[in-house]
Amino acid sequence: MAKYLAQIMVMGMQVVGRAFTRALRQEFAASRAAAEARGRAGTESAAVSSLSGISLQEAQQILNVSKLTPEEIQKNYEHLFKVNDKEVGGSFYLQSKVVRAKERLDQEMDIQSKTEKPKDETTQT
């Protein structure tokens, strides 16, 4: 009886291991394809995400912005920063998340402006 139970457990772990390996390979392939599709800006953006510890999508969700417009980002940042101020009963943790999100979006806008400048220069010459 114990022998069969051990065999069932080993086979179950093998199945889970294979599924995990397959899922991991698919995730790596999807990540690589997405980075290649976005080109150089995608590589820079991924590097910034890994350095800042926050993804672009997460930063957009925190500040509740869909498009990267400086006015909307600044408006939402100021509102969320004031609302989460510790002196008015807010959370320092949430306030720091808001700051990190704004920093990440600012970095992304810098990357986009750098990639747009060479395109503008090539069209003018």
Curated annotation (Swiss-Prot):
It holds the Pfam family Pam16. Coiled coil: none annotated. Keywords: Membrane, Mitochondrion, Mitochondrion inner membrane, Protein transport, Translocation, Transport. InterPro entries: J_dom_sf, Tim16. Residues 58-110 are annotated as: J-like. Probable component of the PAM complex at least composed of a mitochondrial HSP70 protein, GRPE, TIMM44, TIMM16/PAM16 and TIMM14. Associates with the TIM23 complex. PANTHER family: MITOCHONDRIA ASSOCIATED GRANULOCYTE MACROPHAGE CSF SIGNALING MOLECULE, MITOCHONDRIAL IMPORT INNER MEMBRANE TRANSLOCASE SUBUNIT TIM16. This is Mitochondrial import inner membrane translocase subunit tim16. It comes from Xenopus tropicalis (Western clawed frog).
